[in-house]
Each structure stands twice: as structure tokens, then as C-alpha cells.
Amino acid sequence: MNETSSYTIEEVAGLLKVSKLTVYDLIKKGVLPAYRVGRQMRVDEEDLKQYKTNMRMSQPIAAKEAPKQVQEAEPDGRPNVMISGQDISMDILSKHLENAIQETPLRKYKGSLNSLIDMYQGKCDIVSLHLYDAETGQYNAPYVKRILTGEPFCLINVVLRKAGLYVQKGNPKNIQGWKDLKRADIRIINREKGSGARVLLDEQLGLLGVNPADVVGYGDIVTDHYAAASQVSSGQADAGIGAQHAAHMGSVDFIPLIDEQYDIVVLKKNEQLLKAVKEILNSEDYKANLSHLNGYETKLTGKVILET
């Protein structure tokens, strides 16, 4: 380890006893935060420790080889269950579900809105959501009702968490809330279209009457919370949008601005799958896995939010 308390990719691979390709895969998925120094990627010691702690607690399948595509099927021709969503809680759910249904679920790492559209098109069985609707002040239900037209569904809470802004340590630009993002001296790092964080930002800018074109950095995109936090930590942006849990691993300060509801939706026609998911979410084992993670609140975990 060097004097800055960080590791090269080769060193991380050696410590984890995996290949460099596996380490790059973890970084790409946002499971392991990293940043660039010149042409070299580095991983902070504390981030590596946190990753190893999360692995011991949950052993999520996200840390294994890249997931198979949705088109793949088991030998008997029956397709695997597909879970779409980027949060580690979905990796933990996948592991529990594998034991419950004796089948390895496939994982798709897509944003909330894009995943919901995939479900409508028959490409996903379980979709995680954190989509804020400014008109109603609600999370998820308004979007699910609009998009899953004619499809009876069950919307169930997974966790409650804080969403807001990542800022550099010490908050040198004195960023306090959404309105500060229109300042000319503030550069943000944005999220991809269809992600819950992008929807949250766009809804908040709309409430303030701010034109996205006036926000410096609005067109700069990353595809997960950890990458957003890493961009802020490295000084490439002054603020990023995301959930609290990534701030700890991304070595940034966090400004909480809204209580976020992270839910999953399952179509009711998948009766056995829905039954298994409800049992897992209400189990003490699953809640215990989540309670060990930074910034996760489980008081509503397993509660049915809406069903049609």
C-alpha cells in the first residue's frame, strides 16, 4: 500500500484473490468505488474494507462473474427469474431467492424507470424503484400505475433511505440544497436518463423553475451512485445526486434532502415468485442483512405499499 492509503487494481486483485478483470467488473457495477490518478485506477483502503465487510454480511452475487443475459434459459427451456436494479439490497434479495426457489436469478443493473419499462415489455420479473413524483410528493406508485397499465401488480417496500447531494469534504462551496445547483460556480455530475437519481433531480429543478441547460455539468453522466460520489471526491464535480450509503464509500460529505422510498414491484400473475419475495422481505434474516448497511432503514421493509 502506498502513502496515500490506496491500492492499485493489481494490489486489489491480489488481496481479494481474484483477477484484475473481476476488479474492473466490480468497479464498473459500482460495487467497489475507485478513482483515477493520471492513467491509473486506485481504490482507497477504507472503500476496500467496506466492500469486504459488505461481502461478509450479504455475499451478494454482484461480486461474482457478470450476470447472464435475460434471453438465456435453463436446460429445460424455462427462463431464469430476472431482477433489475442497481442497489446492493437486490443482490442480497437474489441470494435469498436462490435458496427459496432453487434457481439462480439473473441480475440486470438498470435504473428505475428503464427497469419498469422493461417489466412492461416482459423482460423483468422483479424491479426495484426509487422514482419521485413532484406532483403528488410520492415515490414509485404514480409511475407504476401509469406504466404497468392493465397489469395487476404488487408494490412492496425494501428500505427507506436518505437521498440528496454528495459534496466534497468540508463542503467548500457551501452547497445547501437543490437551488444551489443553478449557481455558475457549481459543477454537478448527473445520472443517466431513467435512473431514480436523475428523475429526482429533474423533478426538483422543475419545482424550482430551473432550466436544466442552466445547470453546469448537467450533461456529464455516470451510471451509479458510487461513480457520482467518486467524481465529487476526486474534484471533477462539486456536487452529485444520490443516496446516503454511497457517500461513506465515496469519501464525500452528504447533504440529505429527501426521505427516499426504495420499493420493488412484482406482477401478481407470478404468484409463486411473489409469495417467495414477500416471505424473504419479511424475514428477520433479510432485514438483518440490510440493517448492517450504512443509511438503510428497515421499519417498512416487507410492507405492501400498493397492489392492484
Curated annotation (Swiss-Prot):
GO MF: DNA binding
Superkingdom to which the source organism belongs = Bacteria
Protein name, as recorded: Uncharacterized protein YvgK
- The gene for this chain is yvgK
Species for this entry: Bacillus subtilis (strain 168)
